[in-house]
């Protein structure tokens, strides 16, 4: 069986070696006589899996001891709804910087609970740039400032951590976590759905400065209280054990591959290949994002018209290049180059782009 190159924005491609190991261990895991999906989450066997996943993630991301790590059910949208409940008083101001579609989604989830203030919004320019920090209108007593580190739809990425003074900086890193070195101490909290760089859909990671967990927040059930989850080692309720196990395998694979520094180099190489093909096409392929904020993970581009876009998608699929159709919100083409995408995948895409242009340009 030959695996195609999968450019899906999420759920995304996983390392083949991780999939092979999971396949081998699906029916009977580690000599226990049962599958990993069948054993109790409170058994010593699974507790060891969970502990190893956290330890490896701490090593991979250089997470300081004064930050707690949570493995939660669901995705980033759930987390976005829980942030104001846990870290802001009713009606308290929170600042949001909108650099694309998912920044708007974060605001939608927070609005029922707090006074959401838009500190900056890239929409007037079409989300092709991020407003400079000096232009942000920050509330002096905001509970936190929220950014989306990488926008998968518009292909816009924060290349540097913004300085928001003494305000806690919260960031959605769902699509760029572990893609390059990150100084977590610059943030009060970061979070990520796993299904792009960390593993399968259905589990997320929250990394939060412990002192922030002491905030009263708003009245909420225990299941929505991050402090309660920390106290119970992310096992306040039955967690998605299979997803947690796969996340652990993926994180271990990243460490074996050289860690974040190695992936940063590979990701830069992959992105340079694809952007080079776009910029060198004489306008046949177009990406309008400012070079200083171009995403390394998600590269949207457009051809002359929708018919040509559709032809590109169908022909690329026949060539073994999957899921290149752009998001419905913007159309066009989108290539997602997460950590598990090898350089060979970017090379294959670029070769196809050159061939397609020769035939249809």
UniProtKB/Swiss-Prot annotation:
Pyridoxal 5'-phosphate binds at residues 76-77, 102, 152, 172, 195, 237-238. Transmembrane segments: none annotated. It catalyses: O-phospho-L-serine + 2-oxoglutarate = 3-phosphooxypyruvate + L-glutamate; 4-(phosphooxy)-L-threonine + 2-oxoglutarate = (R)-3-hydroxy-2-oxo-4-phosphooxybutanoate + L-glutamate. Belongs to the class-V pyridoxal-phosphate-dependent aminotransferase family. SerC subfamily. This is Phosphoserine aminotransferase. Its EC number is 2.6.1.52. It comes from Xanthomonas campestris pv. campestris (strain ATCC 33913 / DSM 3586 / NCPPB 528 / LMG 568 / P 25). InterPro entries: Aminotrans_V_dom, Aminotrans_V_PyrdxlP_BS, Pser_aminoTfrase, PyrdxlP-dep_Trfase, PyrdxlP-dep_Trfase_major, PyrdxlP-dep_Trfase_small. Pathway: Amino-acid biosynthesis; L-serine biosynthesis; L-serine from 3-phospho-D-glycerate: step 2/3; Cofactor biosynthesis; pyridoxine 5'-phosphate biosynthesis; pyridoxine 5'-phosphate from D-erythrose 4-phosphate: step 3/5. Keywords: Amino-acid biosynthesis, Aminotransferase, Cytoplasm, Pyridoxal phosphate, Pyridoxine biosynthesis, Serine biosynthesis, Transferase. One of its GO terms (cellular component) is cytoplasm. It is an enzyme of class 2 (transferase). Its cofactor is pyridoxal 5'-phosphate. Signal peptide: none annotated. Gene3D superfamilies: Aspartate Aminotransferase, domain 1 (3.90.1150.10), Type I PLP-dependent aspartate aminotransferase-like (Major domain) (3.40.640.10).
């Amino acid at each position: 069986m030959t695996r195609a190159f999968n450019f899906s924005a999420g759920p995304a491609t996983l390392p083949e070696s991780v999939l092979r190991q999971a396949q081998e261990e699906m029916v009977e895991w580690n000599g226990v006589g049962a599958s990993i999906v069948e054993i109790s989450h409170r058994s010593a066997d699974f507790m060891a899996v969970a502990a190893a996943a956290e330890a490896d993630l701490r090593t991979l991301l250089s997470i300081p001891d004064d930050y707690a790590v949570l493995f939660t059910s669901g995705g980033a949208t759930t987390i976005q709804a829980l942030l104001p409940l846990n870290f802001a008083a009713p009606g308290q101001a929170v600042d949001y910087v909108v650099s694309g579609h998912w920044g708007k989604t974060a605001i939608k989830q927070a609005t029922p609970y707090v006074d959401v203030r838009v500190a900056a919004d890239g929409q007037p320019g079409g989300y092709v740039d991020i407003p400079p920090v000096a232009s942000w209108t920050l509330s002096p007593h905001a509970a936190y400032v929220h950014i989306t580190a990488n926008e998968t739809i518009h292909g816009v990425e924060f290349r540097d951590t913004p300085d928001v003074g003494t305000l806690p900086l919260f960031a959605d890193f769902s699509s760029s976590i572990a893609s390059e070195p990150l100084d977590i101490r610059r943030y009060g909290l970061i979070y990520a759905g796993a299904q792009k760089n960390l593993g399968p859909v259905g589990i997320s990671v929250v990394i939060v400065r412990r002192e922030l967990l002491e905030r009263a927040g708003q009245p909420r059930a225990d299941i929505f209280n991050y402090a309660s989850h920390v106290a119970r080692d992310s096992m306040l309720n039955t967690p998605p054990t299979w997803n947690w196990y796969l996340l652990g395998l993926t994180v271990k694979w990243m460490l074996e591959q050289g860690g974040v520094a190695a992936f940063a180099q590979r990701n830069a190489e992959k992105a340079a290949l694809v952007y080079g093909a776009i910029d060198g096409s004489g306008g046949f392929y177009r990406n309008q994002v400012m070079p200083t904020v171009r995403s390394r993970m998600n590269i949207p581009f457009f051809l002359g018209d929708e018919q040509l876009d559709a032809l590109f998608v169908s022909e690329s699929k026949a060539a073994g290049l999957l899921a290149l159709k752009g998001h419905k919100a913007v159309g066009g083409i989108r290539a997602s180059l997460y950590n598990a995408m090898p350089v060979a995948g970017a090379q294959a895409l670029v070769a196809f782009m050159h061939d397609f242009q020769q035939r249809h340009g």
